[in-house]
Structure formats: structure tokens, C-alpha cells
From Swiss-Prot:
Belongs to the bacterial ribosomal protein bS6 family. Residues 101-124 are annotated as: Disordered. Gene3D superfamilies: 3.30.70.60. GO terms for molecular function: small ribosomal subunit rRNA binding; structural constituent of ribosome. It comes from Polynucleobacter asymbioticus (strain DSM 18221 / CIP 109841 / QLW-P1DMWA-1) (Polynucleobacter necessarius subsp. asymbioticus). It comes from the Bacteria. This is Small ribosomal subunit protein bS6. It holds the Pfam family Ribosomal_S6. GO terms for cellular component: cytosolic small ribosomal subunit. The lineage of its organism: Bacteria, Pseudomonadati, Pseudomonadota, Betaproteobacteria, Burkholderiales. Residues 105-115 have a biased composition (Basic and acidic residues). One of its GO terms (biological process) is translation. Binds together with bS18 to 16S ribosomal RNA. Keywords: Ribonucleoprotein, Ribosomal protein, RNA-binding, rRNA-binding.
């Protein structure tokens, strides 16, 4: 079995259904004997360019290990799911289990926001 990194972009109006999509893809992998090494929900982010007149979308990254048939099933699911705007599948040499650079950035942003909300308001 080979290792892959998959990033897919979901329509921002369908953000609530992202966990269900991830569960469906997990079930497909589990049924075929594949392994999931890392799943990261990067959340709603600004896109580099407009797709279907949208400036923001919901990003998800998955690092998996599966055979070619299972990968084709996943790719078929991405292509025929109208909520998935784009997807990218990259073959990797080894399993990635550490947080990605994007996830570290998301965690920094969340920490900064929580620090700002926890700070007492200064009277002007």
C-alpha cells in the first residue's frame, strides 16, 4: 500500500457537513483495509483565487495509506460530490503524522484569538 496526502476544498455553505464527509471517507478507507495517519480540518480560509465566485472555502487535509482501488473510489467520491470544489492527491514516500504547517498556523490563530478574548478590556 502507498501513502498519500489528500487536500480537498469544500463549498463554504456546506461547512456543517464536513465532519459527515470525513466520516464517510474514513469508512471507505476502513472497509478497504486502508489506514488514516492524520486528518486536519483547517477550517474556512481565504482561497488564492476565486472558484465559482467564492473567495473562501473549507479546507481539509488527510494523510492516508491505501491501495490503488481505494484511492480511485475516494477520487470518484470527490469528483461527484458537488460540495467539493477542488481536490488534490499527492503520493508521499512515508506516512506523515505530525501536524502540518497549516495546522500549526490555525492553532496559533486560535491561541491568539483566545488570548485576546481572555484579556481584560481596557477602559478608554
Amino acid at each position: 500500500m502507498r501513502h498519500y496526502e489528500i487536500v480537498f476544498i469544500v463549498h463554504p455553505d456546506q461547512s456543517e457537513q464536513v465532519p459527515a464527509m470525513i466520516d464517510r471517507y474514513k469508512a471507505t478507507l476502513a472497509a478497504a483495509g486502508g489506514k488514516i495517519h492524520r486528518i486536519e480540518d483547517w477550517g474556512r480560509r481565504q482561497m488564492a483565487y476565486m472558484i465559482d465566485k467564492l473567495a473562501k472555502a473549507h479546507y481539509v487535509c488527510m494523510n492516508i495509506e491505501c491501495d490503488q482501488k481505494t484511492l480511485e473510489e475516494l477520487e470518484h467520491a470527490f469528483k461527484f460530490n458537488d460540495a467539493v470544489l477542488r481536490h488534490l492527491i499527492i503520493k508521499t514516500k512515508k506516512a506523515e503524522t505530525e501536524p502540518s504547517i497549516m495546522m500549526k498556523e490555525v492553532q496559533r490563530e486560535e491561541a491568539r484569538k483566545s488570548a485576546q478574548s481572555d484579556a481584560p478590556a481596557v477602559a478608554a
